[in-house]
């Protein structure tokens, strides 16, 4: 198997996976951040459309406040406050003023060899440099 197949097999609890198969893989880390139209909408839709009000495994979820820093408008600060409040309610770590999340996530140890990482930002693929599938 390729490295990607090995990571996805482990994340799906299977001995092996092959190209073209449908699998259900559990990410090691889900990364999100304070970007209007994404994080705020995600939180709202998860609750309203799917009845999900609690992160299943807070140890696998991380939030970064790394956009619009410092907040230049009240609406930006409101988004930051809502992101902090949601993170506290969920019991997930919220990192801010440390740098860009998809870079800092590696520095903080969220990216490691063999990890399966999910994020809605395409830049997360750079975590492949650490041996992760992102």
Label the predicted regions.
Residues 1-134:
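Fe-S-dependent hydro-lyases/dehydratases of central metabolism
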């Amino acid at each position: 198997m390729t490295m990607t197949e090995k990571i996805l097999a482990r994340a799906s609890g299977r001995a092996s996976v092959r190209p073209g198969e449908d699998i259900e893989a559990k990410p090691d880390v889900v990364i999100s951040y304070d970007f209007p139209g994404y994080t705020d909408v995600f939180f709202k839709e998860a609750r309203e459309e799917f009845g999900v009000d609690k992160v299943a495994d807070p140890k696998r979820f991380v939030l970064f406040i790394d956009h619009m820093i410092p907040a230049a408008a009240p609406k930006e600060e409101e988004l930051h406050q809502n992101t902090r409040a949601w993170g506290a309610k969920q019991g997930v770590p919220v990192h801010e003023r440390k740098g860009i999340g998809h870079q800092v996530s590696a520095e903080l140890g969220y990216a490691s060899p063999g990890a399966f990482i999910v994020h809605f930002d395409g830049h997360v693929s750079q975590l492949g440099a650490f041996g992760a599938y992102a």
